[in-house]
Amino acid sequence: MSAESGISTFRDAGGLWDKYPVEQVATPEGYAANPQLVTDFYNERRKQLLDVKPNRGHELVAELEKHFHVTVITQNVDNLHERAGSTEVIHLHGELTKVTSSFQPNNPKYIKELQPEEFEVKIGDKAGDGSQLRPFIVWFGESVPMIETAIDFCEKADIFLIIGTSLNVYPAAGLLNYVPAHVPVYLIDPKQVPIASGRKVHVIQKGASEGMEELTRLLVK
């Protein structure tokens, strides 16, 4: 979804992810071994947010709120959906603009939203419990605290839309299994994405912005 805004995805060649092995910057073990490296990596990712803006795809998702009750469930950690105007966003993998306690990362009491002038987190910056501030990111090997909330929304969905995902990162990729069988499912992606057999899916093989233009015409008549 955010690739069209200039944010490199985890699997795309190029960008920040090519500089470091995932094990070094996106696991609890990597953080324990070298907190400075991980802190610098996420500082750099936050700075990238200042240079990008929501694309037309983000804006069209937000505009659907004029016609539907829209809940966005995203694996992206940027804030582009919110900046585009979406009002109900579930971040499965955390949020780049927030930091939290190293000891109790999911304790709401210690989760802090950073203003742009605070994006440069330093070793020595403390959470309310005295621990080092760490990125509010769900790293590989950690549980996904918002997954049950996401499942609940999927079970109640009237329309289900999938945009720009390879459907191979779990548990998010399994959310489609919770969508009732009668609910129409739309998939927007320029590449071919494997879908579980037996599920009828309306595929729009385009990028996020172009695909959302087409979907909006289909849904809003």
Predicted regions located by residue number:
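Conserved catalytic core of sirtuin-type NAD+-dependent deacylases
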Residues: M1-K221
